Regions:
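Bacterial N-terminal signal peptides that target proteins for export
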Residues: 1-11
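Bacterial N-terminal signal peptides
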Residues: 9-23
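N-terminal "domain-start" segment that seeds a small globular fold
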Residues: 23-53
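Short active-site neighborhood of thiol/selenol oxidoreductases, capturing the structured segment around
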Residues: 52-75, 81
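Structural microenvironment flanking redox-active thiols in thiol-disulfide oxidoreductases
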Residues: 75-115
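Short, internal strand/loop/helix patches
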Residues: 96, 113-145
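Thiol-/selenol-based redox modules, centered on thioredoxin-like
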Residues: 143-180
């Protein structure tokens, strides 16, 4: 009996993990906040150093985190922002994606999905740690939890700790409108 319960618990945990990586999250509400945005740099898909402070100076900045490049949920999240990129750009919004993936994986993901924004390769988790993004599967794999931040004037003004996938851009547009 105890063995069956252990098996059931293990299966439920595996299902939850797989859903968080591959599944579709519902639209996140997020919360308005106000604290200094992390000043850090990372390496993009092309190997160039991206200084986040320089990006923040260009205008409102969306920094979104995702577990794994090329997986269904992460693709929906990134493509939501890709499809709204022209509208976001008109508002002066910069977009940066971050995951633990290696540079070559980020480069492939960007090319495959025709993403018009940088993807930060963060295999050591320095950017993830700077933003205090939770890690999934600690000790087993390095996967960032799906989260999104909106930065204005060097301050994080909105944080969605359970960021949506297909509705990511709609959430950001809504928050931008509320902040005007």
């Amino acid at each position: 009996m105890k063995f069956r319960l252990l098996i059931l618990a293990a299966l439920l945990m595996i299902a939850a993990i797989l859903h968080s990586i591959f599944g579709t999250a519902v639209a996140g509400e997020g919360e308005k906040v106000s604290y200094d945005a992390p000043i850090i740099s990372g390496v993009n898909q092309d190997g160039a150093t991206v200084n986040f402070a320089d990006i923040y100076k260009k205008g409102p900045t969306v920094v979104f985190f995702y577990p794994k490049a090329g997986t269904p949920g992460c693709t929906k999240q990134a493509c939501s922002l890709r499809d709204a990129f022209a509208d976001l750009s008109k508002e002066g919004v910069q977009v940066i994606g971050v995951s633990f993936d290696k540079q070559e994986d980020q480069k492939k993901f960007k090319a495959d999905q025709k993403l018009p924004f940088d993807l930060i390769a963060d295999p050591e988790g320095k950017v993830v740690a700077a933003f205090k993004v939770d890690k999934m599967l600690k000790g087993l794999l390095s996967l960032a939890s799906r989260q999104c931040f909106l930065i204005k004037g060097g301050k994080v003004v909105w944080h969605d700790a359970k960021a949506s996938t297909a509705e990511q851009a709609a959430d950001i547009k809504r928050v931008l409108a509320e902040l005007k």
